[in-house]
Amino acid sequence: MCAARLVAAAAQSVYSFSARPLAGGEPVSLGSLRGKVLLIENVASLUGTTVRDYTQMNELQRRLGPRGLVVLGFPCNQFGHQENAKNEEILNSLKYVRPGGGFEPNFMLFEKCEVNGAGAHPLFAFLREALPAPSDDATALMTDPKLITWSPVCRNDVAWNFEKFLVGPDGVPLRRYSRRFQTIDIEPDIEALLSQGPSCA
């Protein structure tokens, strides 16, 4: 068993994990987000749904961030090589290419990582174990096996860019959504979690 899976197997919540911000600096412990509702997505700047999903992520963070939502984006190049920029190039790609028009994410973006295979970030290994399939499409799989570039391949692998994981204020993953489920349509589920009470830091 690889180290990422060992760490994931021992974890009880996302608070056991950390990730380095895209802008650089020290790793951010997800434990610092205790009490917040988290929406975690693997993102890519050259995907067919980049404009839709990035703008919807911004919209959810803008509207629901003050009430306790934190959106987290993890660039990943494992799906069709659609995040082939270097870490330091991603923000400019978003600003000038796609979505373009001066777009700037208002949510946390982290350094590129893998979400599947032996090199998967421990956070994603944990999320995949906790939520083995998207709730809206339990049969979601990679549509073209020729595009699989990682090993081992597991049934709970993320199938493409912009899969979403909703995590409650206790750090426990609650629901997984496929790439086809629009980010903005998660709002009712987020609202339900936020209405359960104020977030506590």
Curated annotation (Swiss-Prot):
Q: Coding gene? A: GPX1
Keyword GTP-binding appears in the UniProt entry: no
Q: Which terms are listed as keywords in the entry?
A: Acetylation, Cytoplasm, Lipid metabolism, Mitochondrion, Oxidoreductase, Peroxidase, Phosphoprotein, Selenocysteine
Q: Which residues carry this modification: N6-acetyllysine?
A: K86, K112, K146
- Positions modified as Phosphoserine? S32, S195, S199
Places the protein is found:
Cytoplasm; Mitochondrion
List the active site: U47
Q: Which Pfam families match?
A: GSHPx
Name recorded for this polypeptide: Glutathione peroxidase 1
Q: What does this protein do?
A: Catalyzes the reduction of hydroperoxides in a glutathione-dependent manner thus regulating cellular redox homeostasis. Can reduce small soluble hydroperoxides such as H2O2, cumene hydroperoxide and tert-butyl hydroperoxide, as well as several fatty acid-derived hydroperoxides. In platelets catalyzes the reduction of 12-hydroperoxyeicosatetraenoic acid, the primary product of the arachidonate 12-lipoxygenase pathway.
Q: Which GO terms describe its molecular function?
A: glutathione peroxidase activity; phospholipid-hydroperoxide glutathione peroxidase activity
* Subunit-structure text: Homotetramer. Interacts with MIEN1.
In this UniProt entry, the residues modified to N6-succinyllysine are K86, K112, K146
Q: Which organism is it from?
A: Pongo pygmaeus
Q: Where is this site: Subject to oxidation and hydroselenide loss to dehydroalanine?
A: U47
User: Per the similarity annotation, which family is this?
Assistant: Belongs to the glutathione peroxidase family.
Report the EC number(s), separated by commas if there are several: 1.11.1.9, 1.11.1.12
What reaction does this enzyme carry out catalytically? 2 glutathione + H2O2 = glutathione disulfide + 2 H2O; a hydroperoxy polyunsaturated fatty acid + 2 glutathione = a hydroxy polyunsaturated fatty acid + glutathione disulfide + H2O; tert-butyl hydroperoxide + 2 glutathione = tert-butanol + glutathione disulfide + H2O; cumene hydroperoxide + 2 glutathione = 2-phenylpropan-2-ol + glutathione disulfide + H2O
Q: How is it modified after translation?
A: During periods of oxidative stress, Sec-47 may react with a superoxide radical, irreversibly lose hydroselenide and be converted to dehydroalanine.
Which superkingdom is the protein from?
A: Eukaryota
Q: Please list the GO biological process terms of this entry.
A: arachidonate metabolic process; glutathione metabolic process; hydrogen peroxide catabolic process; lipoxygenase pathway; response to hydrogen peroxide; response to selenium ion
Which PANTHER family does this entry report, sorted A to Z?
GLUTATHIONE PEROXIDASE, GLUTATHIONE PEROXIDASE 1
Q: Which taxonomic lineage is given here?
A: Eukaryota, Metazoa, Chordata, Craniata, Vertebrata
Keyword Iron recorded: no
Cellular component GO terms, alphabetical: cytosol; mitochondrion
